[in-house]
Every structure is written in C-alpha cells, then in structure tokens.
C-alpha cells in the first residue's frame, strides 16, 4: 500500500502523530533521503539554496535560563557580557554588506525575554523597514511578543519572526525553566495572527531522544499553515553553559532531521543552521539532498563561529548552485 511518505505529491497534512513522524525518522537512511529528495523536488528547485545572514543586534544579559545559550545571564562563566542595542545605521550597514555578498534574507537577533515598547522597539522597527528597503527579506528574533507588537512588526514589513520551540514538549523542561512551551506557542500564534511568516525549528544534541525530536516536528507540522521556514540546529556546546560537555551530534542525525522535516512540511524552507561548521562538505551536501534549502552565510551566528563565506561559496559552486553575490564581487576586483 502506498503511504504519504512514498508520494511526493501527497496532500499537505496537519494531522501527523508522533509515531508516524518517528517511523519516518527511523527509516533506513538511504530510503529516507530518497523519499525526502522526491518530496523536495516536487515542491522546490533543488538549486535554490537561500543564503541568509544573521546578526546579533543586542548581545548578552538575557534573563532566560536556556541551558544551551551563552547569552543567558544565568551562565556568567560563558563570558558574554550584556551589550546595548546596536544603532540602526550600523545594523543597516551590516545588511548592505550581507546583500553585496549574496544574502537575500537578513536576520536580526536580540537577547531579550520580551521587547519593551519604547525607543528600543522603535529602533527595531526602523531596522526592519531599512532591511526591507534594501530589497531583502527581514527576520527578527526578540523573544516573546504581544499581539500589538506583532502587528507593529507586520506594519514595518517584517517577512518572518523566528521563535524556536527548541525541542519536544516532554523534554523542554530539562532545558528551560523561565519560559513555558505555552509561552512559545502563544507568541507563534500572535505572529500568525499578524500575518507574519513563522520561522520555527529546534536544536538536536541536547540529550533528547528520537521521540522528542519527532514530537517537536509534530507540533510544527500540525500548525496550519506550516511554518514558512524551519531551522534545524545541532547543539554548539559552549564552555560555561550547562550543556558544555555534551558530545557532538552525529552528522547523520542532522541529515535525518532535515529529511523528516522536509517530508512532513513539504513547502517550508528547511534551514541548515547552527552546528553546520562541524559538518564535512559531504555531510552538508547530503543535507541538501535530503531537503535542506537554506544556510546562514557569514562567519558568525550570533555569538558562535560559522563557516567561512568563501568556503560556502565554493561548496555551492561545486554542487551547481549559483552564487551571484560572490560572483559580482569577484568580477569587480
């Protein structure tokens, strides 16, 4: 009997069970990647791998206690102090440079529990308007939002709001105690209600089981519509955080997550995000084959190191993906 996982043109579903998703995740890897690739090609151009740039516009001092995050004020040994919000002009200069290097999406992150209405939130709105004025997609991650804040971001032209679930509901309490799962879901609903695209994914390698990974994907896949984009992150274990001693993620687990996300959310952009620096070129290509179609471009992801831009450009060239921004810059030299 043909199942939905075997049909790349199957109807979009919003009624997945955790057991169904875990069964997909646990398929023999070659079968899983093949099925995911068929779904991917039915809904996306395989040569379209978006390059997004991510900038920390306000670093450190976050009151949340996320066990993986060096920006938490609870993890002082991580050595990241509280910094002020960057000036609007400085952020837009970074956006211009990212665009010149070929990025089409500019993401801005602030280490807040929730933004306060006032001058700083107004500055973020100006940043969003400025990025959109450059012809780029704009995404921000600012913590929890009120409905009115989401509406103001929508009016400023925000393309997407990032607010990750991090993990499945049952494991969540082992990672974070200062914000509930319901808090996260409420922010996602406010974003949807404002008409902003949802960017929402999670992190693997924090000690969760496969069932927790499947449960996180189930929450995402049962939203209607599916998230506009789904970042898949591998833990970057940072000294001074509670997860500093976690072992590295098996690259094939990252491939499985990308493939499973692609199958259950066929039209979403699957973003191969944090932890990519630890992958070989071949492992990255396998993730692309399995349905990942975005990377973060630039040598930092908030406060952790990322792949070198030149190496990324060469990898994309080698697999036949156009990299117009880099080619324009090289032609001008």
From Swiss-Prot:
It comes from the Bacteria. Keywords: 2Fe-2S, 4Fe-4S, Biotin biosynthesis, Iron, Iron-sulfur, Metal-binding, S-adenosyl-L-methionine, Transferase. Residues 47-276 form the Radical SAM core domain. Its EC number is 2.8.1.6. [2Fe-2S] cluster binds at residues 107, 139, 199, 271. It catalyses: (4R,5S)-dethiobiotin + (sulfur carrier)-SH + 2 reduced [2Fe-2S]-[ferredoxin] + 2 S-adenosyl-L-methionine = (sulfur carrier)-H + biotin + 2 5'-deoxyadenosine + 2 L-methionine + 2 oxidized [2Fe-2S]-[ferredoxin]. Its cofactor is [4Fe-4S] cluster; [2Fe-2S] cluster. InterPro entries: Aldolase_TIM, BATS_dom, Biotin_synth/BioAB, Biotin_synthase, Elp3/MiaA/NifB-like_rSAM, rSAM. Binds 1 [4Fe-4S] cluster. The cluster is coordinated with 3 cysteines and an exchangeable S-adenosyl-L-methionine. GO terms for molecular function: 2 iron, 2 sulfur cluster binding; 4 iron, 4 sulfur cluster binding; biotin synthase activity; iron ion binding. The keyword Transmembrane does not apply. The keyword Transferase applies. [4Fe-4S] cluster binds at residues 62, 66, 69. Homodimer. Belongs to the radical SAM superfamily. Biotin synthase family. Catalyzes the conversion of dethiobiotin (DTB) to biotin by the insertion of a sulfur atom into dethiobiotin via a radical-based mechanism. This is Biotin synthase. It comes from Methylobacterium nodulans (strain LMG 21967 / CNCM I-2342 / ORS 2060). The gene is bioB.
